[in-house]
């Protein structure tokens, strides 16, 4: 830095950068207001900057321009978008029409005649808006309950035995090992005879 007459030159605009407005990145100096993505002009900081040669980008634009090409452009599920990067000079590939490979309705009758699957508990038709799959079978949301206590279940909290679904507590009491505690842990010890 010169002793008199200002500071280093900004890597973006070329003007003098004084200490109070200085941002340093990759050995270069920038004005705070010039430390912007080369494409979208977003303000950058040390956690959002990505450098390519002498150019600075936000991580999103850098990924679109230099990252792997494909669904989501490698940014993670939280930032998926439909921007194909045309303004970066990226030529979009011609889109192929989507053709589903399988019908999500597994019932052969339903596939052939357009009907709905039957609920494993009540036997009535289960339509997509109210369908839950548990133990590999369709259920109404209201029927997706423990067969013993009636507690609502989730696909991660159920256990299945002989085609019926149970909460973990009822399953342990009715089908688990018999004896001290019924297999529920020390907090629920009960002596069985």
Curated annotation (Swiss-Prot):
It comes from the Eukaryota. SUPFAM superfamilies: Glucocorticoid receptor-like (DNA-binding domain). There is a cross-link at residue 91 (Glycyl lysine isopeptide (Lys-Gly) (interchain with G-Cter in SUMO2)). Residues 10-61, 119-170 form the LIM zinc-binding domain. Highly expressed in the aorta; weakly found in the kidney, thymus, and intestine. Barely detectable in brain, testis, esophagus, lung, liver, aortic adventitia, vena cava, or uterus; not present in heart and skeletal muscle. A motif (Nuclear localization signal) lies at residues 64-69. One of its GO terms (cellular component) is cytoplasm. GO terms for molecular function: actinin binding; metal ion binding; structural constituent of muscle. InterPro entries: Znf_LIM. The keyword Zinc applies. The modification N6-acetyllysine is found at residues 112, 131, 137, 161. The modification N6-succinyllysine is found at residue 137. Keywords: Acetylation, Developmental protein, Differentiation, Isopeptide bond, LIM domain, Metal-binding, Nucleus, Repeat, Ubl conjugation, Zinc. Transmembrane segments: none annotated. The keyword Nucleotidyltransferase does not apply. One of its GO terms (biological process) is sarcomere organization. It is found in: Nucleus. Drastically down-regulated in response to PDGF-BB or cell injury, that promote smooth muscle cell proliferation and dedifferentiation. Seems to play a role in the development of the embryonic vascular system. Interacts with KAT14. The LIM domain 1 is necessary and sufficient for this interaction. Interacts with GLRX3. This is Cysteine and glycine-rich protein 2. The gene is Csrp2.
């Amino acid at each position: 830095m010169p002793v008199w007459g200002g500071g280093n030159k900004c890597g973006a605009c070329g003007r003098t950068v004084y200490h109070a407005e200085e941002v340093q990145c990759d050995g270069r100096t920038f004005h705070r207001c010039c430390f912007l993505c080369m494409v979208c002009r977003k303000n950058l900081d040390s956690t959002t900057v990505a450098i390519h040669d002498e150019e600075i980008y936000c991580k999103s634009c850098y990924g679109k321009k230099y990252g792997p090409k494909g669904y989501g452009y490698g940014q993670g599920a939280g930032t998926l978008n439909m921007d194909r990067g045309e303004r970066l000079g990226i030529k979009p590939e011609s889109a192929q029409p989507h053709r589903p490979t399988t019908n999500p309705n597994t019932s052969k009758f339903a596939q052939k005649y357009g009907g709905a699957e039957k609920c494993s508990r009540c036997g009535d038709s289960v339509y997509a808006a109210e369908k839950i799959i548990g133990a590999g079978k369709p259920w109404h949301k209201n029927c997706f309950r423990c067969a013993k206590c009636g507690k609502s279940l989730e696909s991660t909290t159920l256990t299945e035995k002989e085609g019926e679904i149970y909460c973990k507590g009822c399953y342990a009491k009715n089908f688990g090992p018999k004896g001290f505690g019924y297999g529920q842990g020390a907090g629920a010890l009960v002596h069985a005879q």
